[in-house]
């Protein structure tokens, strides 16, 4: 069993090379083949004459972008390496002008994500996340199902402060592990394995829904809203929360029960868990100075982010203000910032992929692809088209190891096709954005946020594929049947 509380690096491969000589050899061999495949695909697309409706620049940028995404999907390179090579290739071949290529590094949305990563460090450092976890267990933990709801509540509360579900998994995982151990779970106990699996899968699944609830709870969310602006949609913190509230909260109520029936843990009653949590809280004592500062800062951030549109306040500036307060009060130090090395990696690959995706749209490639897909779906009524696009968008995620890469590659295409077929742009945009979050549990590799839970030793790979598929299908049904009328009412 792993007990690490640190999330996996965003700049590394999702699948770590196995230890030992044979594992390393296998990894290098697989990587070498994948790199040749990636290069071959890039060259084939590059030298094939572009379709009549497309210019050479758009076609060659597509060759580079497709190869970049393929490299990540098949494990040729980590996402950082692939993105850097892709951007450099686009610039050096003259496909992207220098000023355009570097413009995304000053994009306010991307800067907001990076600052929010640094803000999230304070929640972990001061222990506020752990305290919230114990409080939720003391309130909800009298049964196994109650523990699952406690996980969902804690995750939903801390989610808006974490722009990375991967980083948030580093806070949530040790809490789930503590719950499991308090319930008598250990690798040696065969009579508690399904209980451990239930709690671990609850942690994985909760991350998918808390990320859908809040705009700032997953790094791809604000990127998606930025892309949606090209269709005249202005999605802010408050409007996202209103749109997500009804279907997402309903999922949070329903899914723990679905998981309980699906996994069938050996133990259903947990009478000692609340007492254990209260004892842990008592040992922690009162709120520390740093916890009070962090709590007050994040309350202020959430309020200002929620009112940013009406007050005319820049959301990125609000994030910088919060970071400044935490640095000025000593809650965070320059040493803490220096430890967040993955933030720089995230900044670079976000910006690189974003500008390539954005320029594909600007050069007409997304419109061209949308027209082709629309021809395939031609004749479908808007309702059927919306459902088809959503289901296909979700199913394709089996091929991706990054939610953000999936969104950057396909969100604009599917939204454009839907609009051409008469689907409401706000409706489809929100449905696709929410799906980008809840499809993260489709497979073990579907999100880097899964890795700590998958590595716990309590989740079998076969079970994960089955449970993940059922969770995702159930979410699709709820978001379609309940979310659609709600979005038609509130989304603009």
Where do the protein language model's features map onto the residues?
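Transmembrane helix-loop junctions in multi-pass membrane proteins
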Residues: 45-53, 94-100, 128, 304-313, ...
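Interfacial loop-to-helix junctions that mark the boundaries of transmembrane helices
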Residues: 24-31, 52-60, 72, 99-108, ...
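Flexible hinge motifs at transmembrane-helix junctions and intramembrane kinks/re-entrant loops
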Residues: 51-59, 66-84, 101, 257-264, ...
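Transmembrane alpha-helix interface/packing and boundary motifs in multi-pass membrane proteins
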Residues: 69-78, 154-164, 204-215, 307-310, ...
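Lipid-exposed faces of alpha-helical membrane segments in multi-pass integral membrane proteins
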Residues: 37-44, 63-70, 85, 89, ...
């Amino acid at each position: 069993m792993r007990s690490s509380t640190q999330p996996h690096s965003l700049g590394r491969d999702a699948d770590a090379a196995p230890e030992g000589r044979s594992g390393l050899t296998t990894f290098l061999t697989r990587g070498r083949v994948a790199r040749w495949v990636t290069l071959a695909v890039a060259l084939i697309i590059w030298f094939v004459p572009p379709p009549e409706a497309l210019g050479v620049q758009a076609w060659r940028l597509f060759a580079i972008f497709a190869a970049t995404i393929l490299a990540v999907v098949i494990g040729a390179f980590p996402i950082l390496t692939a993105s850097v090579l892709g951007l450099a290739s686009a610039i050096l071949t003259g496909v992207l002008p220098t000023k355009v290529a570097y413009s995304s590094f000053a994009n306010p949305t991307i800067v907001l994500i990076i600052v929010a990563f640094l803000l999230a460090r304070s929640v972990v450092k001061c222990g506020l996340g752990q305290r919230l976890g114990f409080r939720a267990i003391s309130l909800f933990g009298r049964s196994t199902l109650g523990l699952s709801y406690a996980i969902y509540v804690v995750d939903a509360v801390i989610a808006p402060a974490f722009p990375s579900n991967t980083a948030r998994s580093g806070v949530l995982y040790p809490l789930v592990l503590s719950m499991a151990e308090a319930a008598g779970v250990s690798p040696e106990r065969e009579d508690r394995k399904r209980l451990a699996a239930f709690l671990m899968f609850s942690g994985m699944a909760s991350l998918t829904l808390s990320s859908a609830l809040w705009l700032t709870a997953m790094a791809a969310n604000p990127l998606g809203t930025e892309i949606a602006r090209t269709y005249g949609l202005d999605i802010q913190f408050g409007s996202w929360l209103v749109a997500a509230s009804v279907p997402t909260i309903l999922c949070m109520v329903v899914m723990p029960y679905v998981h309980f029936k699906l996994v069938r843990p050996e133990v259903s009653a947990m009478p000692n868990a609340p007492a254990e949590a209260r004892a842990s809280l008592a040992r922690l004592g009162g709120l520390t100075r740093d916890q009070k500062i962090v709590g007050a800062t994040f309350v202020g951030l959430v309020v200002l982010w929620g009112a940013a549109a009406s007050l005319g306040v820049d959301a990125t500036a609000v994030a910088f203000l919060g970071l400044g307060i935490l640095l000025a009060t000593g809650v965070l130090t320059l040493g803490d910032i220096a430890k967040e090395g993955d933030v720089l990696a995230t900044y670079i690959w976000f910006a690189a992929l974003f500008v390539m995706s954005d320029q594909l749209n600007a050069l007409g490639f997304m419109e061209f692809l949308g027209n082709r897909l629309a021809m395939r779906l031609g004749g479908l009524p808007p309702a059927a088209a919306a459902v088809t696009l959503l289901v296909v968008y979700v199913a394709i995620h089996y091929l991706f190891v990054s939610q953000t890469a999936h969104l950057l590659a396909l969100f604009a295409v599917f939204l454009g096709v839907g609009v051409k077929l008469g689907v409401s742009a706000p409706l489809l945009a929100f449905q696709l954005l929410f799906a980008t979050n809840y499809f993260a549990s489709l497979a073990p590799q579907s999100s880097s946020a899964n890795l700590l839970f998958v590595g716990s030793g309590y989740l079998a790979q076969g079970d994960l594929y089955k449970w993940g598929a059922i969770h995702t299908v159930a979410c699709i049904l709820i978001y379609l049947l309940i979310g659609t009328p709600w979005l038609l009412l509130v989304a603009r």
